[in-house]
Amino acid sequence: KSSIKLDGSPNFNDRVEIGPTELAFDEWVKAGIEIPNLKKMREFRVNRLIKELNKRDLDGVLVFDPLNIRYITDTTNMQLWNSHNPFRACFISNEGYIILWDYKGLNLLSSFNPLVKEVRNSASMFYFANGDKRKSDAQKFALEIKDILIGKNKGTHRLAVDKIQIHGLRALESQGLEIHDGEEVMERTRSIKGEEEIKAMKCAIHSCEMGMYEMKKHCLPGKTENDIWAVLHSENIKRGGEWIETRLLASGQRTNPWFQECGPRIIQNNEILAFDTDLIGCYGICVDISRTWFIGDKVNITPKQKELYTEAYLQIKENTSIIKPGMNIKELVFGGRELPKKYEELRYSCKMHGVGLCDEWPLVQYPIDYVDGAFDAILEPGMVLCVEAYIGEEGGFEGIKLEDQVLITETG
């Protein structure tokens, strides 16, 4: 067999690097889906970030958010635990020099990526790990960052930082560093996907849809919501996916209002089931699509169910149809299909949003929620948007949730 997998990663059974399983690869090949080249995808991401740093005249960006670390290094380490225990960090200079702070300073989980030039220890400054010495530990880390900037001849010390503990921010500022908003830098950088990222997303979506196909087989009266949701989890992991961000699956009258979490409710005959995948799948790519299914043996759905579903479908279809490069966000907010007044109270939190490694910038609000100046941006090819709709009346019995993930191309 080949020593290289179809995505260019090592075909070595005992490798450390995570990734898609053979089941996923086989399904992609059968479906005729192009598989990404991970080396090219990683290089695109780093080069795009370098460009954005230089556009802002920044010396570099320091990130703690595990998804921003993933974007820069394509490495993982206990992603969910890390999301609330920030023991990792990553610095990239405006020339592309990458330093990763990881557990014990080990390159165990990053040696596969030659773009990571150094691995260091001790970026922690949170209470669980550092206790009442976190302030002094933050000062040590800040000195290290200053030394890095001096060593890179970064005389201006203009550093972007995304999400840092309060002692860390104070320590960096005490060293005379000029701190800028790293979250803005990373969100805007991540908003444009390269060719290989788009291939990776298509693969992730296909794997999610295969999981949904298996999930639908288990959608039977007498099953609990958790029974059904567990199938999506299982099928995601089987294919090399990573986790699910939310618990947005509900049945029957629990579909109204939306945002009730998946639980032990037993699904009855002739009910609807609505869910939002919010799934972090293969390659760490987010697949964020929503569907509402009918469960039971009745031939015809009720007139009310048809009314709700039709409106949700038309919201998705018509709002998607207006998307094209060159539009500004405000045009999307006030364009497309108007939401009927009777559904306004329970409207979803947005009409659309970006997506990549998770739900991402930009957010497209409903006109009633619009805040002038909050999301000033022009749509560009390579952006991916999720178009959403929740249709349900206040005090109503049921609601319908639909959502599609769409790529903006040169033509639409």
Can you annotate each of these PLM segments?
Residues 1-412:
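Active-site neighborhoods and metal-handling regions in enzymes and metal-associated proteins
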